[in-house]
Amino acid sequence: MADLAKIEEQLSSLTLMQAAELVKMLEEKWGVSAAAPITVASAGVAAPLAEAVTEKTEFEVVLTATGDKKVEVIKIVKDITGLGLIEAKKLVDEAPKSIKNNVKKAEAEEIKSKLEAAGAKVELK
């Protein structure tokens, strides 16, 4: 360890010109290059990565099961969709069924929590 400390101390005392000369000498002696390898990213690889990183902004709210409180779920679906009572009941009876499409994340989460509070099972897609 003492030898390594001495080498470190000697290297630290080198001027920039001396360090460059040392690099050349070592490259020649060991047959290596100190230059960092250059990598070029392919546009075909970068595009899918950028898409994967972006967060989804619009969601589809899907009712997968009604649960025990079917009447309450129908009322919530009626309020969310603006449908009449009969249309809302039909939609709930046809579960799994899409309730609302192209909604923002916050609205989708709110709809999901309302339906789940009524005992329904909901997926966001």
From Swiss-Prot:
Family annotation (InterPro entries): Ribosomal_bL12, Ribosomal_bL12_C, Ribosomal_bL12_C/ClpS-like, Ribosomal_bL12_oligo, Ribosomal_bL12_oligo_N_sf
Function summary: Forms part of the ribosomal stalk which helps the ribosome interact with GTP-bound translation factors. Is thus essential for accurate translation.
Database matches in PANTHER family: 39S RIBOSOMAL PROTEIN L12, LARGE RIBOSOMAL SUBUNIT PROTEIN BL12M
A GO term from the CC aspect: ribosome
Origin organism lineage: Bacteria, Pseudomonadati, Pseudomonadota, Alphaproteobacteria, Rickettsiales
Name of the featured protein: Large ribosomal subunit protein bL12
UniProt-listed SUPFAM superfamilies: ClpS-like, Ribosomal protein L7/12, oligomerisation (N-terminal) domain
Keyword Ribonucleoprotein: yes
Entry annotated with the keyword Amino-acid biosynthesis: no
Organism: Rickettsia prowazekii (strain Madrid E)
Family per record: Belongs to the bacterial ribosomal protein bL12 family.
GO biological process, one term: translation
